[in-house]
Amino acid sequence: MSLIGLDLFDFVKGIVLLALTSGATYAIGKQFFSSNYCAIARIIQALLLFASSFLFDSAGALILGVIVLIIGVGNYLAETNSKFAFLDPNLA
């Protein structure tokens, strides 16, 4: 038992929740936000991971949600503002 309660099973639950939310959020993002759907989809996915981490008691999903949120916000900033293009390797 670790100090923060993150073990292998908990991290696997987070990866499964990441995989389950991935396809749905990209479909929603592509349907409603055609210009920068990838960044919006990652932000929606991060919010779903935050909610599901508390619902399924998964610290792994919470950690992955923070990582996905940081990537999503970085992509959104890179796509909407040319000063932040260095955040996305495809735009730099």
From Swiss-Prot:
It is found in: Host membrane. GO terms for cellular component: host cell membrane; membrane. The chain crosses the membrane at residues 11-28, 32-52, 54-74. It is a multi-pass membrane protein. Signal peptide: none annotated. The keyword Nucleus does not apply. Keywords: Host membrane, Membrane, Transmembrane, Transmembrane helix. This is Putative transmembrane protein ORF92. It comes from Acidianus bottle-shaped virus (isolate Italy/Pozzuoli) (ABV).
